[in-house]
Swiss-Prot record:
Single GO cellular component term: cytosol
Cofactor-binding details, from the entry: Binds 1 zinc ion per subunit.
The protein's Enzyme Commission number: 6.1.1.16
Binding annotation for Zn(2+): 28, 208, 233, 237
Assembly and oligomerization: Monomer.
Protein name: Cysteine--tRNA ligase
Top EC class for this record: ligase
Molecular function via GO: ATP binding; cysteine-tRNA ligase activity; zinc ion binding
SMART domains: DALR_2 (SM00840)
Amino acid sequence: MITLYNTLTRQKETFEPIEPGKVKMYVCGPTVYNYIHIGNARPAINYDVVRRYFEYQGYEVVFVSNFTDVDDKLIKRSKELDESVETIADRYIDAFYEDVGALNVKKATSNPRVMNHMDDIINFIKDLVDEGYAYESGGDVYFRTRKFQDYGKLSHQSLNDLKVGARIEQGEQKEDALDFTLWKQAKPGEISWESPFGEGRPGWHIECSVMAYHELGATIDIHAGGTDLQFPHHENEIAQSEAHNHAPFANYWMHNGFINIDNEKMSKSLGNFVLVHDIIKQIDPDVLRFFMISVHYRSPINYNMELVEAAKSGLERVRNSYQAIEEREAIATDIEAQSDYIAEIDKILEQFETVMNDDFNTANAITAWYDLAKLANKYVLENTTSTKVLGRFKEVYQIFSDVLGVPLKGKDSDELLDEEVEALIEERNNARKDKDFARADEIRDQLKEQNIILEDTPQGVRFKRG
C-alpha cells in the first residue's frame, strides 16, 4: 500500500488510482532555452524514482513531462542569438535528453511540446471565453480568477487574502488585478500564431493545462513539480483545467524541495547556477543521482562537493559489496541455502518496501541498501558459498538498483564517451547518404556491442545505453 504526501490536502494519503493498475502522471518539464541546471535535474530524478517504484509494484505508468518551447525566456534568447525560437528549443531538447540520460532517467511516455499543441490551446481558451471564465481585453485574453471559487486551494490561500505581488501579473486592461494571462497579443518581431482573439501566443500556465488534458484526460492521478511551481503556476493550472473540464484536475499533488548551493539559494544574481551539462564532466552522473536521492524529495538539499564526495563513498560501498558477492558466486559450489541469511535479506527488502511505501522515502531506502551491503560483507567474510544465498543477495541488489535507478556497476574505462558515440552516429549517417551500407551496418554493430541502441526520431537519430 503506497502512501504519498498530497500538497492539496497537506497530509499523507493512501494512493488510489483512477483506473486500477494504472498511474497517470504529469510532471512539469523545463523551459528549453538553455542547458538544465541541477534544480531541474532534481524533479527529473525524484519523479523517475516514483515512476520506477510504481512499476516495481506492478503498475502501468503513463508518464508525461512537457517541454515549454514558447516562452519569454526563449524569445529573449532568440533575439540574443539571432536564431529562431524553434531552433533553440530543438537544440536544448536534444541536450536535455543527453543530460537526463546520463543521470539514468527513463524516457517519458510522452514529452509534449507547446508548439505542437497550439490549436488545442486556442480551442481550450475559446471554451473558457464562451463559458465566461475568460475575457478579451486589448488583444490579450485573461482568466477571471474570482469566478473560480476554489482558487487558492492548492497553496491554501483565500481569494480575499491574495494581494497583487511580484508573482501575480498586473495590468491596467484587466478587470481585476488577480486575473492572469491566457493569451498574449503579438509584439513586433516575436513568434506568434493566428487565433480568434488576434495574433499572439499563449501564456505559460495554459500550456501545461492543455498538454495534460490532451495527453492524460480531464483528471490525472498525480501532478508533480518543484515547490516553486506551487503558486501561481499549479494554482492557475487547477483554475483553468477545472473550469474547462468540470472535473478535478489531479487527485494528488507532489512537490519536491529546493536545491541550495553551499547553503545559498541558487540564483543568477549570485552566479552559482550549476548546469548538469558541465557538472557531469567533473562528477560521475551515477554519483550525482545517488546524491540527489540521499535526501527525501520534499526536503531541501544542499549541494556542495563535501556532500557529493560522501555520496560517492556511499555508492562505492554498495558497489564493492556487490562485486564481492559476484566474485564469491563465481567460485560457489554449495547449493544448500542458509535460511537465516535468506530471512535477513528478505527482511531488508521488506524494510526497503516499507520506507518506499511511505511517501517514497529514498533516504531511508538507501539506509536499507547500506544494511544489505553490510550483511553481504559479513557473509563473504564467513567464506560460505551457498549459491541460493548469493543468488538472493543479487536479486535484492538488482531490485534496489532498478527502483532507485543507480547502476550496480560503474562505466567501464573502455566504454565510448557520448562525444565518441555522436561522432560514430554522424559517420554512419554520412555512410548511409553515400550508400555505403556495409560501413553503416558495421558502425551499428560496433555500437550494439557497447550496448548502445540507436533510435530514429523526427529530430534525427538518438542513442540510448541499454
